[in-house]
Design a protein with these regions (language model features):
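Short secondary-structure boundary segments
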Residues: 36-37, 73, 119-120
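Acidic, PIN/NYN-like endoribonuclease modules and their adjacent C-terminal/linker elements
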Residues: 105-134
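Glycine/charged-rich beta-loop-alpha catalytic/anionic-binding loops adjacent to active sites
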Residues: 24, 60-62, 85-91
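Short, well-structured N-terminal submotif of metal-dependent ribonuclease cores
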Residues: 1-34, 47-60, 124, 133
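Active-site neighborhoods of divalent-metal-dependent phosphate/nucleic-acid chemistry enzymes
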Residues: 68-114
């Protein structure tokens, strides 16, 4: 089981170079958790780039049985705030996690799972990265 960040979902949706590696990681994991906040952030980005029709495709993707949408509970809320204090945008830390990032981080942290992501921001935190992810 793994957690997916917005950046990983977008790489799959927009057929970015990491797409095949991310799809393989999702298939290996059998179950991929996604914060409901991550879903909102993903929809916002997709809508801004490609419009509402593309958002419908994202929703279809996330309805596949390999994905589980998880709303933040009290533990995730506390972990997201702690991540903001430690790694959040505007705090001078090189990770500079944004609001959406905080909830993917929190879900992975609370569940003790690795995070599937693209880019260097999470590499500057204490969260484990999915093995084999680019």
């Amino acid at each position: 089981m793994i957690v997916a960040d917005t950046s990983a979902i977008l790489a799959v949706v927009f057929a970015e170079p990491e797409r095949d590696a991310f799809v393989a990681a999702i298939e290996r994991a059998e179950r991929t958790l996604v914060s409901s906040v991550t879903v909102v952030e993903t929809r916002m980005v997709v809508h801004a780039r490609r419009g509402q029709r593309a958002v419908v495709l994202v929703d279809d993707l996330l309805r596949l049985p390999c994905f589980e949408i998880v709303p933040p509970g009290a533990a995730e809320m506390d972990a997201a705030y702690a991540a903001f204090v430690a790694f959040g945008k505007g705090n001078g830390h090189p990770a500079s996690l944004n609001f959406g990032d905080l909830f993917g981080y929190a879900l992975a942290k609370v569940r003790g799972l690795p995070l599937l992501y693209k880019g260097a921001d999470f590499a500057e935190t204490d969260i484990a990265r999915v093995v084999g992810d680019p």
